[in-house]
Curated annotation (Swiss-Prot):
Active site, renumbered: D102 (proton acceptor)
Record's protein name: Type III pantothenate kinase
Gene, per the UniProt record: coaX
One Pfam family hit: Pan_kinase
Coiled coil: none
Enzyme class, spelled out: transferase
Organism: Psychrobacter arcticus (strain DSM 17307 / VKM B-2377 / 273-4)
Similarity remark: Belongs to the type III pantothenate kinase family.
Pathway membership: Cofactor biosynthesis; coenzyme A biosynthesis; CoA from (R)-pantothenate: step 1/5
GO BP: any one term: coenzyme A biosynthetic process
Main location: cytoplasm
CDD domains: ASKHA_NBD_PanK-III
Length: 242
């Protein structure tokens, strides 16, 4: 199988064997030209001879059409994920037309009917979703730590871009530290507040910035890096069965 995740800035792919083990995986910047990037990867895909391509995409219809045209040249069946608020594995209170495909698949990859879960995605945006025994209750969306920093730098003449790090939530004694620690604290504080309101929910974090943020959260955190892939596999496995 070939699994594709077409995000806002990056294309990720996983090639898995017959028992679901990953045999090849990579992530690349697509620069809003995912079809062209895929064209350069087709030789690599063909070497593994996948029998199906499952696709998660947050891109618009125009780019998805170009991706479809490129994939059609492989002569391999492919299908895009369609968000469904009434999906059997997880119901959602959310308007499915407004629920991002990648966010939904991350939840689908984590959902456990026996648990209450607080799933936090740490990518281009910070998403916090509450799932009660496979029912999505809704959630919150924040700018990521890097989007917040970029916004502050672009809107404030007195603060210039620097190479500071998001490594502490204690007060800063330089502007550089104060900016980075303030941004990190705003996100950590929100997560701590939400987890305090929902003490019986397991906290799960995923995404590129998860490890940075998790160490400052005041609850045990389970880190997962396989949720979107797991969600893709669950989605198409259930589709085949039904």
């Amino acid at each position: 199988m070939l699994w594709l995740d077409l995000g806002n800035t990056r294309l990720k792919y996983w090639l898995t064997d017959d028992i679901g083990q990953i045999v090849s995986h990579d992530a690349k910047q697509h620069l809003q030209a995912p079809a062209e990037l895929l064209m350069g990867l087709t030789d690599r895909f063909e070497r593994y001879a996948p029998d199906f391509i499952g696709i998660s995409s947050v891109l618009g219809d125009d780019l998805n059409i170009k991706v479809s045209e490129t994939l059609s040249r492989l002569n391999i069946p492919f299908e895009f994920v369609h968000v469904d608020a009434n999906y059997p594995l997880m119901k959602s209170a959310y308007n499915d037309e407004q629920l991002g495909c990648d966010r939904w698949l991350q939840m689908l990859g984590a959902v456990d009917k026996t648990k209450r879960q607080c799933l936090i995605g740490c990518g281009t945006a910070i998403t916090i979703d509450l799932i009660d025994h496979a029912t999505h209750l809704g959630g919150y969306i924040f700018p990521s730590i890097y989007l917040q920093r970029e916004s502050l730098f672009s809107g404030t003449k007195q603060i210039t871009i620097s190479n500071g790090t998001f490594d502490s939530v204690s007060q800063g004694i330089t502007t550089q530290d104060a900016v980075h620690r303030g941004i990190l604290l705003s996100i950590v504080g929100a997560i701590n507040e939400i987890s305090t309101r929902h003490p019986n929910f397991e906290v799960i974090m995923t995404g590129g910035d998860a490890a940075i943020i998790a160490q400052h959260v005041n609850r045990p955190v389970r880190l997962r890096d396989d949720l979107l892939l797991n969600g893709l596999a669950r989605y198409f496995d259930h589709s085949k069965q039904s």
